[in-house]
């Protein structure tokens, strides 16, 4: 399979099984992050593995950040339990006169999406999650982020269910997205 084939067949899997890659299995995917285009090689990112109780603590941070109570708090708290492994993607701003913050954040975003593609290609179910609580103070605190760090979101990773629906995407009208300046 070519890289193009892998990208074209990639789809999010919002329902995954309890299987998840081990830390050892993740290491090559983390190493591959060094290949993302990165002006000045700043590596303005880091990844955080969340398993087990860390997911429960994230759920509590979601509930706190949302201000929800009762069933709504339970619902917010259950969101991180949809996969056995969550990989938090963190933008780490590095002081640089050559590379502005927006460009560094773009590198961290590239790391996130490259991880998603690699995990999908390896046969794992992956979906990307963000939302209004992503950069809230309780969620920031739960991830033990430094002042120069911002959370971008999470890759939820698990096994693929036996019956996985094929994503029937509409074909892209490429002419709308690729224009030419003359």
Locations of the language-model features?
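N-terminal amphipathic, basic helical "cap/leader" segment at the start of enzyme domains
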Residues: 1-83, 180-182
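Small-aliphatic-rich amphipathic alpha-helix that forms the alpha element of a beta-alpha
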Residues: 33, 87, 93-142
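Short, charged/polar surface micro-motifs in flexible loops or helix N-caps
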Residues: 52-57, 64, 93-95, 137, ...
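Structural motif
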Residues: 84-87, 153
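Short, electropositive alpha-helical surface patch
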Residues: 138-152
């Amino acid at each position: 399979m070519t890289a193009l084939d892998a990208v074209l067949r990639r789809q999010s899997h919002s329902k995954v099984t309890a299987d998840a890659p081990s830390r050892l299995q993740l290491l090559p995917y983390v190493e591959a992050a060094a290949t993302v285009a990165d002006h000045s090689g700043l590596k303005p990112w880091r990844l955080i593995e969340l398993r087990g109780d860390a997911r429960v603590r994230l759920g509590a941070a979601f509930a706190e950040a949302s201000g929800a109570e009762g069933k709504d708090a339970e619902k917010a708290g259950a969101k991180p339990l949809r996969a056995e492994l969550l990989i938090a993607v963190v933008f780490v701003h590095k002081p640089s006169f050559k590379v502005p913050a927006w460009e560094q954040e773009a590198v961290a975003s590239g790391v996130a999406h490259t991880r998603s593609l690699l995990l999908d290609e390896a046969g794992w179910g992956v979906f990307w999650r963000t939302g209004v609580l992503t950069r809230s103070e309780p969620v920031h605190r739960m991830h033990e982020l430094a002042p120069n760090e911002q959370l971008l979101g999470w890759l939820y990773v698990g096994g693929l269910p036996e019956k996985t629906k094929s994503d029937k995407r509409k074909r892209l009208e490429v002419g709308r997205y690729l224009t030419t300046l003359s």
